[in-house]
C-alpha cells in the first residue's frame, strides 16, 4: 500500500465526519482539527430521527471522499440506501449531538451482497468493510480524547469480536456481523452505545456528536454492495 493511500486510511479511521477535514491534510493534524471542530458544536443534545437516507439528494447528510467515490443511491420506494464500492472509499456523515443517556440504543438494518476475500481487519492493509456505521464523541478541549465506535460487517473477524482500529486506539471496531452466513439477508440491528462504549474505552458516555455510514474497498481493490435501512436512536 502506497504512502498516500496509507494516510487516507489513517484519516478516515473514525475521524472523517467534519468538513474541516476536507482541506486539513491527514494523520495527527487531521485528528486534532476534527476534535477542535467537534468542540465547537452546539452543547445541547438532540434526540430524534436522523435525516432520511433514502430521500433523493440525501438532505442533511454530507459526503467525505478518501480514495475515489463509493456510490450512494437512495431508494425511496424500498426505503433503503444502496452503497456500491469498486476499489473506492467515501462516506456519508451527519453532525448533531445526541443524548445517549435518554436514547442509548442505535438501531439500523443492513444487507450485504458479498464480503471481501483475504483481508485482515486488524491490520492497516485490511481496513476495508462492505458495511459500517460509526458514532463519534468529541473530547472537548482535550482533543486527543475524541473517540469513535464503529459497527461493522466484517469479512473475516467473527461476530461479536471487538478490536482497536489498526490506525488508532481512539477508534474501536465491533463486528456486529461477520462472514458469509447471512449474506443477502436484510438484518435488523440494535446496539446499546453506552454499554459498547464502556466495553471499548472503559468509560461512560453521555453524548455522541456525529454518525456516519461507509462502504469501502479501496485498499483491497475489490467490490462490495450493501443496503442500509434508516438508522435512528431510541430509549429502548
Give the location of each predicted region.
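Bacterial N-terminal signal peptides
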Residues: 33-43
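Extracellular glycan-recognition surfaces and repeat-rich motifs
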Residues: 57-79
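Extracellular/lumenal carbohydrate-interaction signature centered on repeated Trp-anchored short motifs
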Residues: 95-106, 180-183
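Solvent-exposed strand-to-loop "edge" motifs in beta-rich extracellular domains
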Residues: 109-115, 138, 194
Amino acid at each position: 500500500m502506497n504512502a498516500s493511500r496509507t494516510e487516507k486510511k489513517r484519516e478516515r479511521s473514525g475521524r472523517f465526519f467534519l468538513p474541516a477535514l476536507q482541506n486539513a491534510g491527514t494523520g495527527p493534524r487531521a485528528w486534532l482539527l476534527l476534535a477542535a471542530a467537534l468542540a465547537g458544536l452546539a452543547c445541547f443534545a438532540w434526540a430524534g430521527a436522523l435525516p432520511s437516507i433514502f430521500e433523493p439528494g440525501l438532505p442533511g447528510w454530507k459526503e467525505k471522499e478518501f480514495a475515489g467515490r463509493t456510490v450512494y443511491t437512495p431508494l425511496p420506494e424500498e426505503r433503503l440506501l444502496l452503497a456500491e464500492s469498486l476499489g473506492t472509499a467515501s462516506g456519508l456523515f451527519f453532525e448533531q449531538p445526541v443524548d445517549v443517556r435518554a436514547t442509548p440504543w442505535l438501531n439500523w438494518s443492513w444487507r450485504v451482497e458479498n464480503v471481501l476475500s483475504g483481508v485482515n481487519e486488524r491490520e492497516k492493509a485490511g481496513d476495508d468493510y462492505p458495511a459500517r456505521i460509526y458514532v463519534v464523541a468529541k473530547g472537548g478541549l482535550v482533543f486527543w480524547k475524541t473517540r469513535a465506535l464503529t459497527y461493522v460487517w466484517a469479512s473475516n473477524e467473527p461476530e461479536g469480536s471487538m478490536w482497536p482500529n489498526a490506525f488508532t486506539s481512539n477508534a474501536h471496531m465491533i463486528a456486529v456481523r461477520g462472514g458469509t452466513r447471512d449474506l443477502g439477508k436484510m438484518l435488523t440491528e440494535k446496539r446499546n452505545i453506552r454499554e459498547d462504549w464502556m466495553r471499548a474505552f472503559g468509560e461512560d458516555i453521555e453524548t455522541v456528536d456525529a454518525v456516519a455510514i461507509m462502504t469501502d474497498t479501496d485498499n483491497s481493490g475489490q467490490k462490495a454492495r450493501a443496503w442500509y435501512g434508516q438508522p435512528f436512536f431510541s430509549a429502548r
